[in-house]
Regions:
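A compositional/biophysical signature of low hydrophobicity enriched in polar/charged and small residues
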Residues: 1-154
Length: 154
């Protein structure tokens, strides 16, 4: 990946709706080589997709909870079973295997506390291998996932 590729990625992270012509202008290439580079970055998985960023509160998902999960066993099989089950839960927007006091860290987005309580009792505590759960309710989000820092754009 060279500086031009990083420039393409930088500008698309800022505005995923840029036309190829506008993107080409920003990275100082003509449209054809810009499009070839873009298609390569998509093909090789560097660009995994494009999506709209929604305001969680405006769509009725005003509560974010970070859930620390401990599993019964520290095995690849157990982590895979848990991960497969979590992937099916729409309210879980992120799941990380972590080092520390917990084995997994989930980011859960739900309408409100009663909805989280229901999810916790009926779903999360029933997942394979779960022995302990600690919930951390976000009071306010200061910074959400944003563009990855790739250095100075071209």
């Amino acid at each position: 990946m060279d500086a031009t590729d990083r420039g393409i990625l930088h500008h698309l992270q800022e505005d995923g709706r840029l036309t190829n012509a506008a993107l080409a202008e920003r990275v100082h290439l003509s449209p054809s080589p810009t499009l070839r580079r873009l298609k390569r970055l998509e093909r090789d998985g560097t660009i995994r997709g494009y999506r709209a960023i929604l305001d969680r509160r405006r769509v009725g998902l005003g509560l974010t909870v970070f859930v620390e999960v401990k599993l019964t066993a520290h095995s690849q099989r157990r982590a895979e079973e848990f991960s497969a089950a979590v992937a099916e839960i729409d309210a879980v927007v992120a799941c990380h295997i972590v080092a520390g006091m917990a084995d997994m860290l989930l980011e859960v987005v739900v309408p409100d506390l009663p909805a989280y309580e229901q999810l916790l009792l009926e779903t999360l505590l029933e997942l394979p291998g779960v022995t302990d759960v600690r919930s951390n309710v976000a009071i306010r989000t200061v910074k959400e996932a944003g563009p990855l820092s790739l250095g100075q754009p071209t």
